[in-house]
Each structure stands twice: as C-alpha cells, then as structure tokens.
Amino acid sequence: GVATAIATGGPGAIFWMWIAAFFGMATIFSEAVLAQLYRTRDAHGHLTGGPAYYISQGLGSKTLAAFFSVAIIIALGFVGNMVQANSIAGAFYTAFNVPTWVTGIFTFIIAGFIFIGGIRRIASFAEKMVPIMALIYVIGSLTIIFTNLEGVMHALEMIFVGAFDPMAATGGVIGAGIKEAIRYGVARGLFSNEAGMGSTPHAHAVARVKHPAEQGLAAIIGLFIDTFIVVNMTAFVILCTGALDGTTTGIALTQKAFTLGLGTIGNGFVAVCLLFFAFTTIVGWYFFAEQNVKYLVGVRYVSIYRVLVLAFIMAGSFLHVTLVWELADLFNGLMAIPNIIALIGLSKVVGRALEDYEKKFLAGETPE
C-alpha cells in the first residue's frame, strides 16, 4: 500500500498516512473495546464478534449490520484478497519472471487447501515464520536506510513539502496535487492499519483479556508498529534510494528500491517476504468475511462463499494493479461507513469502559 501511495500521491502521501494513523488510534481503540463488549458465542461455543454484532446489539439496527456484513464480504473476502493475490503475482514476476498465471494457480491451490481444512497446519507454520520474516524485513530495511543516511533528511523534506505541494517535492516526476496526496495517503493508510474499516474487531472479539480497554490499548500498539515503524521503513527505503521515477508503482516500486539498496537479491528478498505477509492476510481476511457470511445466512452458504473467494484470488493475479486498488478503495469505503456510524453512536459506551479502566488502574486494582 505504501509504495502505491507514494507512486500515485507523491511522497507527501506519507504525511497524510501519519495523520490518518494518529486519529486512527482512537478509532481502533473504540473498535477493540466494542468488539469485546458485544461479543457472543456461536453454536459451537466459540467466541465471535465484530461490527455486525455491536451495530445490531448496541445501535439496535439489524439493517445497518446487514449492510456492513455484505460490504465486508465484498471488500475483504473478494476484492481485498484480489489485492493480495495481485501483489504476490506481481512480485514473483518482477523477481523471478514467473508468469502471473502460474503464481495465480499456486496461490489458488494453497488458499484452497487452507480454506478447506489445512488452517491449523498453516497457522502453526505462519506463527513461527511470519515474525522471523518481519524481523528479516526490518533488518533489510534498516541496512538500506543506514547506508543511505544522507538521503534521510531529503526524504523527510520530500514528505513534508509534498504534503502541501507534491509537484515541488518531486520536481514534476509525480503529476499529483494535494488532493491526490491526501486521498492516497489516507486510503492506503486505512488499507494498511485497517483502523475504522471494521475488519480488526473480529480478531479483537476473540482475544482473552481481563478488561475491554486492555484490548483497546493492544490495538493501538499494533497500529503504531504497523504504520509508524514498518510502513515508514518501506517509505524511507523508496525515497532514500531514489527509486521513485513516476512510472513504477505498486510492489514493483518496493522491489526496485530494495534492489538499489541491496543489489540483485533485493527483488527476491521482497517477493519472499511478501509471500508470507500476503498469505497471512488472505487467511485473516477470508475468516473475517466468513464470520459475516455466517452472521447473515448461517453456515449453509459458506461453501459457495469459499469458491467465490478462490475465483477472485485467481482473477486478482491477472488484473492490472491500478484497477484492483481502485476497487479496493471503493469497497473499503462502503465497509467503513456503517462501522464509523456505530463508533460515533456508541462513543459513550467506549468512554465508560475507558473511565472504568483508568479508575481501577489508578486505584492499584487489576482492571477487569
């Protein structure tokens, strides 16, 4: 997302991504608290929850809850997973010249295996590998940044100048105005940290904590790490290496930057890291959306949903990156609207939970 934001909105998009993330901390805190407060158990006794539950139970609007469920099924289950498949296919084509249809079939098969029943095995593997890959990615990024320290101040200048005058920041390389900088910064920031979208509450609902506000604080920490550490590293690698050329976009821009910074291994480095990150995202988004399929129509249509997701994953491998991102922006917005309405309507509920947590914490008690 960050590479696309820079390529389409200029370096200034990063500034607006920071602004969106700053305000998103309050948003994601509220989402996590409400997910905890309005969670329930399914027919098998498993914890479940999310915006559909706090919209229907908290606001008392089953219509708005149904609208959200339909929107998230399309936004994450279908379009969102197209984005991930598109990124994987693009990365492996750039790095290893693997045809997109080959990567598409590979992604289709592995995703199908996961959805049908291999989730525990893959989840166990991902649990071990993703933190390792994240650490390797951070080390690779820091290596490039520290070997290009002279470019850090210039990168900061490009970000702050570009936030209000994108043409001046890039010398006209990126033909974007302030509207594009704000739009793509906020949109890609939303896609990256998911604050306000209504996706992460499904994960927060099943977390076992002593107090709802405790999960809210954990959500804030997660957002901070995602946007202000990982995303910033990618942004500074792109800007410090001078990879921005006005024509390269998406994952190809990130790969170009890492190749300039690490040499020929940069392409493959990004492709392999992305494979792990994108697959865990596909799994997570599939199950977030599946919860809403069950909320709407029960388990009888889950198989149909599963087949459709696999079809969209395959299609995502072939489509042009710009079209995929435009579709993602549209449906992410539709998903966020009912969720934000609920966050505003239930703000007093969140406030009371936070007040209770603070009162107990300051009194030396264990908040629960």
Features from the language model and the residues they span:
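Transmembrane helix-boundary motif of multi-pass solute transporters/channels
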Residues: 1-20, 200, 205-207, 214-215, ...
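Extracellular/periplasmic helix-exit of transmembrane alpha-helices
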Residues: 29-37, 140-158, 166-173, 205-209, ...
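Membrane-interface loop-to-helix entry segments
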Residues: 86-92, 98-160, 293, 298, ...
